Each structure stands twice: as structure tokens, then as C-alpha cells.
Regions:
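Short secondary-structure boundary segments
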Residues: 236, 259, 281
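Short, charged, intrinsically disordered terminal tails
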Residues: 281-298
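Short, structured secondary-structure boundary patches
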Residues: 235, 253-257, 297-298
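Acidic/glycine-rich phosphate/pyrophosphate-binding loops and surrounding catalytic core
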Residues: 2-227, 240-248, 254-256, 263, ...
Length: 298
């Protein structure tokens, strides 16, 4: 992986070493332990080189070009081609793209291009799909104080990439995992005996960790904020009940709505004055953005 690609990943808030591990695992899935693309080896001379275009097949929002570039570079590193691949980006992450737009050109050994193609596209299409879906939510909330948040409902192994795609689409990350924010949910409350008891146990064990509490009623919201919670996750509240919770809590904590949210009702929930709308579908149900790799004909 080149220094410029690593720098681009860092600028996106991604760890190059982590991205490398993701790509290497994906390549092993596709190429097997011997790192072999039998079709390309059989049909394409080793010395042949070509240029290919990454082309959008649908309108959307782009995310993951640096990750796709890293795929081509890593295939070149480990495949023994002995020649470098050059990627020229013609669009940027976070930009809207239209069907037919050329997003980047890739030049290098033809075998390398086709061997890397599917892994590069799988990641690029997935990330761009998440960014596209997120942008629809961000647009739906435009003009309100509410922001759209992702969740931990991510594809195993791809959380960092998918959460970056949410950011590229105009969304916000709340927590990366179980380690950076405490989330007291219904099972924790049952185990501890009450919201207040659960909060106190978390605060005693981890004094510096932010604490969020899941609540389903206005009374629970008041109990949680009086206990000291930093954030409230208001689960499956109607807009009317949520507005009551917002009024009861005031500025003592940030409130996040979740549960059954759709683009059609986003405006109603945002109008309550809630700070965030938490949408698991950003990462667990976003369709891909169709992108293809087209070899240029001579």
C-alpha cells in the first residue's frame, strides 16, 4: 500500500493496518490460499497491461475510493506481478455521482486489474450504498437540529468502513463499540434492579466513560437524567411521547430517538426537538450502489 493511499485512509479516519487486514481477508475468500485467479491466468498474458474505468451504474453518493485503491495496490504487492498499478481518482468521497460517471481510472497489469476487481467493487459498492442511504436521511433532517446516527448493527469485520461511509454520507457516529460508551439497556436494568442502580454501577466502575440509558417512557427518561445519564436512547416512542420527554429532560442530556424510524416519519420525529435519530438500517439494510470496472477497448 503506497504512502499516499495510507495518508488518504488516515484522512478518512481509517487505520491503514486495519483496512489492510480487511482486504487481505477478503482476498483470501476470493482467491483461496494459493492466491489464484484461474480464469485470468489462463486467458491473459502476464505481460499485458490495460486501463479500466470505475463507472457508476446508478446515482448515489460515493464512499471508499481509497479503500478500493488499496485493494488494487495490495493485489500488486502479494501477487508477484512486479509492476505497480496507478489509480487516478476523478471523484471524491461524499460527492453525489450520476449514472455513467467515471469515478476513477486504474492502469496496470490486466491480470491484476481483473483479480482485484470483485474485492475492490464489493467494498466500494457497499460503502457507497451506505453513504447514499445516509445522505437520504441527512437530507430528510435538513433544517432541523436533529442528526442521523448509525448503530452497532454493522457487517462483522466491516464496522470501521461502514461507519466511515456513514460520515461520508452526512451522518454521525455515536459509538464505535461496547468499549467507548456505556449503553444501559433493558436487560442491564433488569439485572441491576433499576435504571438508577445500573447507572451507579457503571459510574463506579468506569468514572470517565459516557453513559447512555435506553428509556421507553417519560418517567424512565426523568429517572435516567436525574441519575446522571449523559445521553438517553428513547426507544419506540411516538412523536407525541418523545416531545414530552424532550420537554421533561430539557438540556440536561442529549436525546436520541430509535425504533421503527423511516424516512417518511423522519420530519415528525425531528420536529420534537430531539438531538439524534438512530437508524440501524443505515448499515444493516442499505442496498449497494452499483459500480462497475470496465476495461477500455483499444
Amino acid at each position: 500500500m503506497t504512502e499516499s493511499t495510507q495518508a488518504a485512509l488516515r484522512a478518512a479516519g481509517l487505520d491503514p493496518a486495519q483496512v489492510r487486514r480487511v482486504i487481505e481477508n477478503a482476498l483470501v475468500e476470493d482467491l483461496g490460499p494459493d492466491f489464484l485467479d484461474v480464469t485470468s491466468v489462463a486467458t491473459i498474458p502476464a505481460e499485458q497491461s490495460d486501463t479500466a474505468d470505475l463507472v457508476a451504474r446508478a446515482d448515489g453518493v460515493l464512499a471508499g475510493l481509497a479503500v478500493a485503491t488499496a485493494v488494487f495496490e495490495l493485489v500488486g504487492e502479494v501477487s508477484g506481478f512486479g509492476r505497480t498499478v496507478e489509480v487516478s481518482e476523478l471523484a471524491r468521497d461524499g460527492e453525489r455521482v450520476a449514472r455513467g460517471d467515471v469515478l476513477a481510472t486504474v492502469t496496470g497489469p490486466t491480470r491484476l486489474l481483473l483479480t482485484a476487481e470483485r474485492t475492490a467493487l464489493n467494498l466500494l459498492c457497499r460503502m457507497s450504498g451506505v453513504a447514499t442511504h445516509t445522505r437520504a436521511w441527512a437530507d430528510a433532517l435538513a433544517g432541523t437540529k436533529a442528526m442521523v446516527l448509525d448503530t452497532r448493527k454493522t457487517t462483522p469485520g466491516l464496522r470501521a468502513l461502514e461507519k466511515y461511509a456513514v460520515r461520508a454520507g452526512g451522518g454521525t457516529n455515536k459509538r464505535m463499540g461496547l468499549y467507548d460508551v456505556a449503553m444501559i439497556k433493558d436487560n442491564h436494568k433488569l439485572a441491576a434492579g433499576s435504571i438508577t442502580a445500573a447507572y451507579r454501577r457503571v459510574r463506579e466502575a468506569f468514572p470517565e466513560v459516557p453513559v447512555q440509558v435506553e428509556v421507553t417512557t417519560v418517567a424512565e427518561a426523568v429517572e435516567a437524567v436525574e441519575a446522571g445519564a449523559d445521553f438517553l436512547l428513547c426507544d419506540n416512542m411516538t412523536p407525541e411521547v418523545l416531545a414530552e420527554a424532550v420537554a421533561a429532560v430539557g438540556d440536561r442530556a442529549e436525546l436520541e430517538a430509535t425504533g421503527g424510524l423511516t424516512l417518511e416519519v423522519a420530519g415528525r420525529y425531528a420536529a420534537t426537538g430531539v438531538d439524534f435519530l438512530s437508524v440501524g438500517a443505515l448499515t444493516h439494510s442499505s442496498p449497494i450502489l452499483d459500480i462497475a470496472l470496465d476495461l477500455r477497448s483499444e
